[in-house]
Every structure is written in C-alpha cells, then in structure tokens.
Amino acid sequence: MAHKKAGGSTRNGRDSESKRLGVKRFGGESVLAGNIIVRQRGTKFHAGTNVGIGKDHTLFALSEGKVKFEVKGPKNRKFVSIEAE
C-alpha cells in the first residue's frame, strides 16, 4: 500500500542553452585577420574600418592590428574598428 499520495506532473523544467554572446576581444587587444571581436544579436556594435560583419551580425577582424571601440554619429552608435599597429 502506498504511503505517499501520487505526485503531480510539472510543465516546467526546461531552459535554452546559453549562446555565449558578447565581446570576445576588448579595446587595445591585438587581433589577427579573421579573429572574432563581438558575437551579438542584431547590431549593438557596428562594423568600422577593417572590420567585417557576418550573417549573424558577428564582427570579425579583416586585418591585423589593435581593436578600437568608439561612439560616433548623430545617433551615438557604437563602432568597432581595427587600427594598424
């Protein structure tokens, strides 16, 4: 004979896997061509000089140099560029 009443089922208990987004190379860091600088959803950061943008809005270095973050334009957008060393 059972000594506990049957436990009910739950509809919770799921969560999505983290996507590891964010800045991967910070300002002043040296990068090689092809290095990923920022992984993002949408254009939180925009591509500046010597920076390419992937189809998932990932920013990556097009040339060797140092990473530079700057705020430009009338809408105060954040740009990431690479300055030659």
From Swiss-Prot:
GO terms for cellular component: cytosolic large ribosomal subunit. It comes from the Bacteria. Keywords: Ribonucleoprotein, Ribosomal protein. Transmembrane segments: none annotated. Belongs to the bacterial ribosomal protein bL27 family. This is Large ribosomal subunit protein bL27. Residues 1-22 are annotated as: Disordered. It comes from Aliivibrio fischeri (strain ATCC 700601 / ES114). Pfam families: Ribosomal_L27. The keyword Mitochondrion does not apply. The keyword RNA-binding does not apply. GO terms for molecular function: structural constituent of ribosome. GO terms for biological process: translation. Signal peptide: none annotated. The gene is rpmA. InterPro entries: Ribosomal_bL27, Ribosomal_bL27_CS.
